[in-house]
Regions:
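ATP/NTP-dependent adenylation/nucleotidyl-transfer catalytic domains that generate, transfer
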Residues: 1-67, 95, 208-333
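ATP-dependent adenylation/nucleotidyltransferase module used to activate substrates
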Residues: 2-211, 235-244, 320
Length: 333
């Protein structure tokens, strides 16, 4: 008869652990994992939001936070944590929002998970689709990418995620305006942050890393600043917590994601962490230090931003990337 597998006890109590934090050496049960995630999330919210005791506007309306959710584990944990930490404040309103990219077999079930979660917390839920924004559905965009790459040098080598990422950012900006959000919360976890930093290093684009959220210390007029309360929480811990809490979440992967640069960086970051526990934290600490030095060196200068000549969105170009891509798609229709 096979012997039962031994399960480590929680480092803080005698209950069975559900996760091992290799970077800290601790084993945590579900209850203490929740406490650990909540503590780190609460600290980030205090640092990134810095809300006064009464955050209401002069007209009496509440301070509105748009929580971008997708139906996945990260945004599910983000919304529940924010609801637990600041959901009882009468001067703050949490609004959840989801972008429908138009991906058959993927977005519909994940959208339903997002809706179920918002309803269970009694949080307002809003959606916005690419079609409502005047863009093509992503399933249609994907079919035209090869031709666009042949016709435009700037488009050569771009993957579906390149288009979707640009359109999603525009969609979230539009959703933030729709609900009059003061700030937008994104569910990026520690692995996401480390992957982004690594990708930008690979491309020699340190400036892109400097511009990563949170943005509350460097706001841009006309755009709701992004905050990332889960940025110090590893993906594995978020997943374990979501399972322990029984949160509604969609487990499927986007069918258009394979081949994206982030998929490669995901494996590299995982290998780094396996060899050197704490490597992800080191990458993010390095970015924070680079950001601090950049801010000190550029105290008297402001980032140059323009309004897109086509749509009016904030951009560093004359015509924003979203409108450029939209034009490429129009040419191939």
């Amino acid at each position: 008869m096979a012997e039962a597998l031994a399960v480590e006890s929680c480092s803080r109590c005698n209950f069975p652990s559900v996760i091992h934090q290799a970077y800290s050496g601790q084993h945590l049960c579900g209850r203490h994992l929740f406490a650990s995630i909540r503590k780190r999330t609460s600290k980030e919210l205090r640092q990134q939001l810095r809300l006064p005791k009464d955050a209401r506007h002069e007209d009496g309306s509440p301070y509105r936070i748009l929580v971008a959710i997708s139906g996945g584990k990260d945004s599910a944990v983000l919304l529940t944590m924010m609801h637990d930490i600041i959901g009882n404040r009468r001067d703050v309103e949490l609004i959840s929002g989801c972008i429908d990219e138009g991906i058959d077999g993927y977005r519909a079930p994940s959208l339903e998970c997002a809706r179920q979660l918002a309803e269970s917390l009694d949080v307002r839920f809003e959606t916005l689709s690419y079609e409502e924004m005047g863009y093509e559905r992503m399933d249609e965009v994907v079919t035209r990418i090869p031709v666009i790459g042949e016709n435009h040098d700037e488009a050569k080598g771009l993957m579906p995620c390149s288009y979707c990422g640009v359109f999603r950012r525009q969609g979230l900006n539009a959703l933030a305006r729709k609900v009059n959000a003061d700030v937008m919360a994104l569910g990026h976890n520690l692995d996401d942050m480390a992957q982004s930093i690594l990708m930008n290093l690979q491309r020699g684009e340190i400036d892109r890393s400097v511009r990563l959220a949170p943005h509350t210390e460097d706001p841009i007029d006309g755009v709701a600043p992004r905050i990332v309360p889960l940025r110090w929480i590893p993906e594995q811990e978020i997943h374990a917590h979501a399972i322990c809490q029984g949160l509604p979440m969609y487990h499927g992967d986007c069918p258009h994601a394979p081949g994206a640069m982030r998929q490669q960086s995901r494996g590299i970051v995982a290998d780094m962490e396996s060899i050197t526990p704490g490597a992800r934290h080191g990458l993010l600490h390095s970015l924070d230090e680079i950001r601090r030095l950049h801010r000190e060196a550029n105290q008297d200068s402001k980032s140059e931003v323009n309004n897109c000549l086509e749509c009016g969105e904030i951009t560093s170009r004359e015509v924003c990337q979203a409108c450029t891509m939209k034009q490429w798609l129009t040419e191939t229709s």
